[in-house]
Design a protein with these regions (language model features):
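Trp/Gly-enriched beta-strand/coil motifs that build multi-repeat beta-propeller-like domains
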Residues: 1-249
Length: 249
């Protein structure tokens, strides 16, 4: 997945590019698919993977959610724009689980952690107040061959929904949620060969989440504008320089 958030507060989602060898991150500021600027962001420690970005301390600036696979420790890196201003340990995950995303699932305006257990394909949400655990709930078990690719409110009912991607068939599916409970599903568009679905956010500001696509072999990005699960149109975005990726880890 890609790390997407509005880092400069202009109402448009931005995304984070990562240098695979140096672990430097850069925030790419966007207006829909158009690059309007960029800024150096923190270099990631060798033991930590960048998983997501959300405003954990409610200072209106998105923060980094980090995960150490070897220790199962989570860390929040507090940012002001692209600048690191502090950090705090989050929960240590149970054995066999990994942090895969962040989103507000219970509507309390505090971002939560989405965790995944590969051996059973179970997902769960860990409800947070900043870096402190206040509860947890099971999310849907993912079918074999499908992976979580994005979180957004696709049907406009308030609660977050999940979008899954099947890398073999290129098919996408939106799972509609009420809190943590699955209440329905709909097929989304099928992607072209060599492209991956890496995030969902409302890039064109029409009130409907869109797909962020990435092609690893050419490092191209594209945005597919959607109305719920229905494809509307597409635009190409930035092609990343050699050695950089939009994938979080």
């Amino acid at each position: 997945m890609a790390v997407v958030a509005d880092f400069n507060g202009d109402g448009h989602p931005d995304w984070v590019a990562r240098n695979i060898s140096t672990r430097q991150t850069v925030v790419v500021y966007l207006n829909d698919n158009l690059v309007v600027g960029a800024a150096l962001a923190p270099t990631l420690p060798a033991n930590l993977a960048l998983i997501g970005a959300a405003d954990f301390n409610l200072d209106i600036h998105p923060d980094y959610a980090l995960f150490a696979p070897n220790t199962l420790q989570t860390v929040i890196g507090y940012l002001s724009g692209p600048t690191l201003i502090g950090a705090a340990s989050g929960p240590t995950l149970p054995a066999g689980w990994e942090l895969i995303a962040t989103a507000d699932f219970n509507g309390d305006n505090n971002p939560d952690f989405v965790i995944f257990k590969p051996s059973t394909r179970q997902t769960a949400v860990v409800f947070l107040n900043n870096n402190v655990v206040v509860g947890a709930a099971l999310l849907p078990t993912l079918p074999a061959g499908w992976n979580l690719a994005g979180i957004a409110d696709f049907n406009g009912d308030g609660p977050m929904d999940i979008v899954l991607f099947n890398s073999a068939t290129r098919q996408t599916v939106i799972g509609y949620l009420s809190g943590a409970a699955l209440i329905g599903a709909a097929l989304g568009p099928t992607l072209p060969m060599n492209w991956q679905l890496v995030a969902a956010a409302d890039f064109n500001g029409d009130g409907h989440p869109d797909y962020l696509l990435y092609r690893p072999d050419t490092r191209e990005t594209a945005i597919w504008h959607l109305n719920n699960n229905v494809f509307v149109n597409s635009v190409f975005g930035l092609t990343l320089p050699s050695g950089w990726t939009v994938l979080s880890h």
